[in-house]
């Protein structure tokens, strides 16, 4: 059928659809980023100056789902990732080649309001386009975020499948980058959507991104570890913090630091297992969301997390000082691990329970919480529920494979087929999605 361009309002052409439409896991949408020749060359040159830079370039964002199509001009596009970052085309110093370009899979972030205020798409202010690095089964991150949602973890981002094309204006045709994960960005709009759904009471609190070393322990709370990260084109001008404040950045840093210190130090000072600690946790954090999130976390074998890896999560304090844990970055799961055996690790001692992980140590010291966590693991594993149980999980993954398989071949020449092998750097090679041994 002929495409139907739908425009509802200039700030969000798909606002009536909402996030359920954008992160619909039952279909493969299409995303095209149209970028001028000069801006793409700037993108490549910026990478050469500093591969870690977060500098945006302008683009036109096009989204197609079924017979509906949408377009937003003047969005911002940048690279994402840590160890996964690389040049999207060619080698160092090379500019764009209109013929026989050497394309590379990369992660992109699209920010709809980078150049124009209040612009959104399906109520989101940004989306992350992630290639399936080290996941030849094209399922790990999508599966994990879907499982969070099924199990009621509304603090987790959402994800779906999409087909990504990069259209360098003037080229004979767009470059097809293949199937990507379309992941919800954790941002102000992320908070606003959850407030609108009645999950949060406020959207204007302090949102933090936690990176390696973020133990949520007093010894990680110094001011030189809490700040607003800046990643510029000049590496010497860049500064990164373990705890990176993402909201209220202009005037609220000192208050946010005080709030975080107060939460950690007060919790740390209360006796483990005590009624005073339980009262504090009940009033100052969403304990149930945390327990549900961690039951899913260990079931999918996420080792590069808060508990084991002191890494890869967000957290949010609402305007009533209540703490919410936000799981994040679940591509290294389902058997892809290092530093632990994710298939046999004790789920009650997934990571440290000493002074290096005060939050986990304190929560697990409350018998009621530990038992609830254990019961959640049982719920996830039960054959009666459509959660983690083997047959139920495999059916979902196989359905997704049927859906995406026709679209895997792409112009990078890489990751062109499904292959049941874990990441080459992983420590347990027998853990393979859809096949493999039970233990490593």
Label for each model-derived stretch:
Residues 2-293, 424-440:
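Phosphate-handling architecture centered on phosphoinositide signaling
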Residues 20-22, 26-28, 39, 99, ...:
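Middle-to-C-terminal accessory/interaction subdomains
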């Amino acid at each position: 059928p002929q495409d139907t361009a739908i425009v509802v309002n200039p700030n969000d052409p798909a606002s009536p659809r909402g996030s359920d439409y954008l992160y619909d896991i039952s279909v493969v949408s299409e995303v095209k980023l149209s970028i001028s020749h000069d801006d793409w060359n700037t993108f490549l040159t910026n990478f050469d100056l500093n591969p870690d830079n977060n500098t945006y370039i302008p683009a036109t964002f096009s989204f197609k789902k079924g017979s509906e199509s949408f377009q937003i001009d003047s969005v911002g596009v940048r690279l994402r990732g840590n160890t996964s970052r690389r040049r999207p085309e060619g080698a160092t110093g090379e500019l764009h080649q209109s013929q026989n370009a050497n394309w590379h899979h990369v992660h992109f972030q699209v920010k709809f309001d980078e150049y124009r205020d209040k612009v959104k798409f399906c109520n989101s202010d940004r989306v992350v386009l992630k290639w399936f690095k080290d996941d030849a089964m094209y399922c790990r991150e999508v599966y994990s975020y879907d499982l969070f949602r099924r199990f009621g973890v509304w603090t987790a981002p959402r994800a779906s499948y999409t087909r990504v094309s990069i259209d360098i204006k003037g080229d004979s045709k767009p470059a097809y980058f293949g199937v990507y994960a379309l992941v919800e960005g954790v941002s102000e709009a992320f908070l606003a959507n959850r407030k609108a759904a009645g999950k949060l009471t406020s959207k204007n609190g302090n949102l933090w991104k936690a990176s390696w070393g973020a133990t949520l322990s007093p010894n990680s709370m110094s001011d030189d570890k809490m700040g607003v990260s800046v990643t510029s084109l000049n590496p010497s001008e860049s500064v990164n913090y373990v705890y990176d404040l993402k909201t209220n950045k202009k005037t609220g840093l000192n208050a946010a630091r005080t709030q975080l210190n107060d939460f950690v130090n007060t919790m740390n000072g209360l006796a483990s297992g005590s009624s005073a600690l339980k009262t504090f946790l009940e009033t100052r954090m969403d304990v149930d969301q945390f327990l549900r999130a961690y039951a899913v976390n260990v079931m999918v074998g996420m080792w590069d997390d808060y508990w084991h890896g002191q890494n890869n999560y967000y957290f949010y304090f609402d305007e009533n000082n209540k703490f919410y844990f936000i799981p994040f970055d679940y591509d290294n799961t389902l058997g892809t691990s290092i530093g632990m055996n994710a298939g046999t690790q004790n789920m009650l001692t997934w990571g440290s329970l000493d002074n290096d992980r005060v939050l986990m140590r304190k929560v697990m010291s409350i018998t009621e919480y530990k038992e609830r966590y254990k019961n959640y693991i049982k719920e996830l594993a039960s054959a009666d529920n459509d959660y983690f149980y083997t047959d139920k999980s495999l059916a979902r993954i196989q359905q997704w494979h049927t859906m995406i398989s026709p679209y895997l071949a792409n112009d990078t020449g890489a990751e062109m087929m499904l292959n049941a092998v874990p990441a080459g750097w992983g420590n347990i090679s027998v853990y393979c999605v859809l096949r493999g041994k039970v233990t490593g």
